[in-house]
Swiss-Prot record:
Belongs to the antenna complex alpha subunit family. Keywords: Antenna complex, Bacteriochlorophyll, Cell inner membrane, Cell membrane, Chlorophyll, Chromophore, Light-harvesting polypeptide, Magnesium, Membrane, Metal-binding, Transmembrane, Transmembrane helix. InterPro entries: Antenna_a/b, Antenna_alpha, Antenna_alpha_CS, Light-harvesting_complex. GO terms for cellular component: organelle inner membrane; plasma membrane; plasma membrane light-harvesting complex. This is Light-harvesting protein B-800-850 alpha chain B. Residues 36-66 are periplasmic. GO terms for molecular function: bacteriochlorophyll binding; electron transporter, transferring electrons within the cyclic electron transport pathway of photosynthesis activity; metal ion binding. SUPFAM superfamilies: Light-harvesting complex subunits. The core complex is formed by different alpha and beta chains, binding bacteriochlorophyll molecules, and arranged most probably in tetrameric structures disposed around the reaction center. The non-pigmented gamma chains may constitute additional components. It is a single-pass type II membrane protein. GO terms for biological process: photosynthesis, light reaction. It comes from Rhodopseudomonas palustris (strain ATCC BAA-98 / CGA009). Signal peptide: none annotated.
Length: 66
């Protein structure tokens, strides 16, 4: 472990809950920011279907040669 000596300064009984709690808070804040600043994400989570774009009309067939 690269930073293994941190546990000589901070008790793991305190440090691990602080670390995991801060990760949880950051994840909740990111999800809140995405939900409050986009219109498509809440619809995606609710399962709303997106209306398919209208199909373009087919081009007319060329005139037959005689």
């Amino acid at each position: 472990m690269n930073q293994g000596r941190i546990w000589t300064v901070v008790n793991p009984g305190v440090g691990l809950p602080l670390l995991l709690g801060s990760v949880t808070v950051i994840a909740i804040l990111v999800h809140y920011a995405v939900l409050s600043n986009t219109t498509w994400f809440p619809k995606y989570w609710n399962g709303a279907t997106v209306a398919a774009p209208a199909a373009a009309p087919a081009p007319a067939a060329p005139a037959a040669k005689k």
